[in-house]
Amino acid sequence: MNKKHSSPAQKKISQQVVFQRRINASKNIEQASNVCFSVLAKSMRKDSFTEFLYMFRNFLDLPVAKNIMNYRYKGDTIDIFNIKTMPFEMLEIRDVVKWLTEIFGYFSEDLNDFVKAKVAITNNILLADFEGAKRNLEKFIDDHGVCNWTIATELSLLYFQGKITEYKDKIKEFTHIEDGLSQSFLTYEGIRCNPSVTSERYRFSIGKMIEEVRIDNQPQLEETIKYRHDFSPCDVYSNMDFIFSNTCEKRIFDMYNSFKRFIFYKYNDGSDISEIVTCVEKLTNSIHDSEIEIFYKRISGTESDIKDEQYNEVIDNYINNNYERVITQSEKILLEKPYFSVIYLPYIKSLVRKKQNTSLPGPIGEIIRLSCNLFSNIEFEDSLKKLSKIYYVLLHNDWVHIIGCILDNFDGSDGINNPKRYNYVDSLLLINNKLSFRDSTNFKWLDDENISAWRRDKIKADKYFYDGEYGKALNLYSNSLDKSEKNYIEELKAKIIYCHFSLGEISVAITILSELLSKGANPRTLPINTVAEYVAKEGHYKTNNDELYNEAIILNAYNKNIIAKYIQHTSNVCENFLENIDVTDKNQITFENESIPAFFLTELLSIDVLEGMTSIIESEVDVLLTRLNIDRYIVTNEEKFDSKTVRKSKNEITNIFYKLIVQACSNEAGEGRIYVDKSSLKAKLINDVERELEILRGSDNKELNTYVELTDDHGIEYHTMSTPFMRDVFDLMMKVSDGYTIDKLYGIDQSLNVGIRHGGIVNLLWAPLKNNGIAALKSKDSKFIPNPVWRNDFGYYNKGFLDSIDKNLVLLNEKLNTIINDAKEKVHINTGEFIESAKVFNYAIEIEFVEEMAGSIDKIDGDTFIELIFNYLDEKTNDCLDYAKNNFIPKLRHEMIDAIQNTRNEIKIENINRAISQSKIQLEESIEFLQSWFNWSGTSKTPFALKAAIEKSRLILSKLHPWLEINFSGSLNTQKIFLGKHFTPIVTLLTLIFENVVKHGANRDSTEIIVDINENNDVIELSFVNKVQEPFNQDELEKFSRINEILDTEYETYSARETGSGIFKIKKILSLELKCKNHVHIHPTENSFGITIGIYDNGGMFE
C-alpha cells in the first residue's frame, strides 16, 4: 500500500504542534528559544532548503514565536554575539540571503523604526545636536534594545562630545561581558572611538590581532578580522560569502546592517548577484529604507521615483566652475542630510578654489575643514591625523567611505583605489551618478560648450584611466596641463606618472616623479608607493647615473614620508651612482666633485644610507666622518643652503662629534654605547614643562581616575586616563619620555642608531667570515655569489664537489645575513607601535607612576618633574639592557653558531672546515664584544691619568682634522689619578677645548697648546692657552666677559643651543655629568685664547 503524503496544511499543523509542545515543556523563554532553533537547525542540516524555509515560516506563524524571536534577535544586554548560530555552512549563499529576507520581513516594523532612528541620530551627531542624539538613541534602546550599532553610535557620540567620564563608564561595562566574542568585538569598538588612541594605534591593534591568526595559519580569520574591524570596499575578501554567512546571525539591527554591507560590496566587486534581486525587491515592499530602494533600482534597472536632482544640480554647477553656487547648494543639502557624502568632494574643492571656510557646524564642519586643509597643504600632518581618527570613529556608517577617498589621496597611492570607494557609496546614495564611470556609459552631456574645454578633457581622460586605456588618458592629461585650473595641475601630473608607469614607460614615470619631488611636491599626493616598490624590487646595476639619481630621490622621499622601508635599497642605488663616476673612497665624496649633485650629498647620503654602502664605506668611523665632512661644508658655506638644511647639519655635527668620542673611548671607558644627553634634554624641555605644570597646578578638578582600556593575551593591562587633569599629566610625562627615548639629537635612540644599528653591528658580525675567507661576494644586484677564492684554494676537487661547497657557503652567507639584519632591526625603541617582543628597548609608563606624578604636581618644580621621569626611564633602560644581554644576545649567538655548525656538517673538506671553525671561534668573540655594547657608555672601572685622556682627545682630533698637527707644550703628567667611570666625560670636555683651538688656531697646518697643570690636596686646575688666527676685537672680548658672568648660572640653557666656543658645554659636563664642584674661566687677550678649569675632589673624582 502506497504511503500517503501530508498536505501542506497538515504538515503545517504537525510542525506547529511539535514546536508548541517543545515550548510548553520549556521552563523559560531561553529554553524555549533553544529548543525551537534546535529543531530548525536539524531541518537545515537534513532537509532541502525549501522544506527548511517552509518549517521556519510555520514556526513564525505561531503566536508565541514573537516572544522567542524577540528574545533571540533583540536584547537589553551587551553580550551582543551570545547566540548559538544556525549551521549556515550547509547553505548556499543565495539561501542564506533568502532566510535573512524572511527574518527582515518578520521584523519589518522594527527595522522601519531603526532606519528612521539611524538617519535622525546620524544627523544629530554630525550637526552637533548631541542632546538630541542622546534622546533619540535612548528612546530607540528603550523601544528595541541594545545592539552593536547602538553601542558604536553611543561611543562615537561620546567621542564628539568629549565626555571622557561617560566613555570610561561605558568601556567598563565591556570588561564584565562573559561571552568572549562579544567582549573582544566591543573592546576593539572601544579602542576605535577612544579619544586617546590615534588611528595609527588602532590599526596597529588590529594588525597585532591579524599577526596572531597569521602565525596560526588561519587566513580566513585574517580576512574576518579586517571585515569586522577595518572594513574597506577596496580590500579583497577572497571568501566573502564565508565571512558573511559565518558572522551574519546576531542582533536584528546588526544583521540588517551587515546584510546591506555584504550586498553593496558584492555589487561593487562585480559579482553576479542576480539570484538575490527578488530578495532585495521583497525588502523594498516592507522596509522603507532609501538605501535599499536605491540599490534595488540599480540592480533591477527599473524606473525610480527617487531622483538624484540635488546631486545633479551640485555637479552641474561644479563642472561649469560655478563654485560659489556649489558651496551654497552643498551647505543647504548638508544641513538637511549631513551624511550625503557624495557631495563632500565637490563642496570641499569649491571651498578651496574660492578660499572660503565652511559654515557647517559640528563634526560635519570639522570633516570639511580638515579636508580643505589637506587639499590646501595647511597644517597637513595634524589635519591628516585628525581626519583619519574621525574616519575610524564613524566607520560603522557606510557613507563614511568618501572620507576614506579623501584620505587615500594623501597616502602615496594617488587615490588609485578611490573608484571602488566612490562606487560603493554611490550604490547606497545615488540611482545614477553622472560622473561615475561605472554608472554612466554615455557622456554626451560633455559636448555642452558651456563646460570648459579643460574640464571636458579631464573627465574624458579620467574615464579612459578608469577603463585602463592609459594611452588615451595620457594624451588628454598631457594636453590639459596648460589649460587646467591651477589647483588641478598637481593631480594631472600624478595621473600622468601613473599612466606612463602602467604603459611600461617606467623610466619616464620615474623621471617625472623625481623632478616633482626635487621641486618640493608632497610625496603623499603622488603615486610614490607604486613607483618606489618597483624601484626597490626591480632595481639592478646601471651605468646611467641620471636614472640612478632619480631612483635615489624617489626611494629617499618614500623612506622619509611614507615608511622607512627601502633604506638598504637606497644605499645600493647611491653606491652604484658613485662607482659610475669612479668614487671608490669616502674622501672623494665632496661638494667639490662636480659629478655629485648637491642634493645627493645634503639629502640622500644620510648616516643610514652611508652605513649600507659597504664597498665605499669600510668602517663605522668612516660612516660618521663622511657625513661630518658633508655637514661641515654646509655649515661653513651656509649662504649656499636653506636655513633648514643648515640647522639640520649643525645638530648633526654635534651628534657625530659625541659619537666619535664614545667610540674612541670604548676601550678605555668600557665598551658600553648607551647614552642619553639628559642635561641638554632638560634645557630643551624645561620652559615648556614649567609652563604646563603651572597650568596643571591651577586645575579645578585634580581627580586621579584611570581605567583599563584592554587586557592583552598575556594579561597586560592598557589604561586610559579618565579625567582632563590625568590626561594632561600623562601627556606632559610623555613629552619628557619622548625626549628621553626618541629625541633625534639627545635621546637614547641616537645611541642605538649610531652606536649599534649603524655603528658597527653589521661589520662586527661579518668580520669573522671575511677574516677566514668564507664570506661570499655580492653581485651588483646585491645578491650573494660564490667567492672565487674557494675554488682557487681547492681546485683539485671535482666540479660537483666544488659546486656543493659554493652552494653551502652561499646559503650560509644568506642565512647569516638574514639573522644579522633581523637582529639589527630589533635594536629599536618601542613606544607602542610594535608588539613588545619585536624590539629590545620597550618603554611603557605604568599607571601607578602616572598616578604618583599626578599626585605630586603641587609639590614639585619642572626640574624635579623631569629628573623623576628620567630616573624612572633609567630603570626601564636597565631592564632593557638586562634583556639584551640575557635574552637577545644569547638567542643571536645560538642562531649564528647553529647556522655555522650546520654548514660545517655539510662540507667534507678539512681546510674549509678549519676556516669555518676559526670563524665560529672569532664569531663567539664578536658576539661577546657586541654584548658589551649594551651597557651605559663611560662605565669603565679602570683608573686613568690625565695624560691618557689628553692623548685620546688628540687621537679624536686627528680623525676630525687629519691634515692638522697638534702639539702640546708643558708637562702633561699629574699625580692625581681619575676614577675610570669619568674617562668619557673628561675626554669630551678636553676635545671641546681642543676643537676650539683648531677653530681659532693661528696656523691651519699645525697648532700649539700651552698646558699648565696645578695640583693641590683637593683640586686639580688645568689651563690651556693658544694663539689665535685673527685678533679678537673689542666686541668679541666683551662677549667673552659676558660669558664669564653668566657661566655659573645659565650654562644649562646655553649649552643646549650654543654652536660657538663650547664653554657652556664644558661647564655642563663638569657640573651635571661629573657632578663635581668646579670653576671655569676664560681669559682671552687680543692674540690668544685661554681657559682654566678647576676640578675639586668630592670624594668621587680621584682614586
From Swiss-Prot:
Residue stretches of each TPR repeat: 818-851
UniProt GO MF annotations: transferase activity
Domain of life: Bacteria
Catalytic activity: ATP + protein L-histidine = ADP + protein N-phospho-L-histidine
A GO BP entry: phosphorelay signal transduction system
Keyword Transferase part of the UniProt annotation: yes
EC number of this enzyme: 2.7.13.3
First-tier enzyme category under EC: transferase
Modification Phosphohistidine, positions: H758
The keyword Isomerase appears for this protein: no
Alphabetically ordered keywords of this record: Antiviral defense, Phosphoprotein, TPR repeat, Transferase, Two-component regulatory system
Post-translational modification comment from the UniProt entry: Autophosphorylated.
Role description: Sensor-kinase member of the two-component regulatory system Detocs that confers resistance to bacteriophage. When the system (DtcA-DtcB-DtcC) is expressed in a susceptible E.coli (strain MG1655) it confers resistance to bacteriophages T2, T4, T5, T7, SECphi4, SECphi6 and SECphi27; the level of resistance varies, resistance to T2, T7 and SECphi4 is not very high.
Official protein name in the record: Detocs histidine-protein kinase DtcA
Native organism: Enterobacter cloacae (strain JD6301)
GN (gene name): dtcA
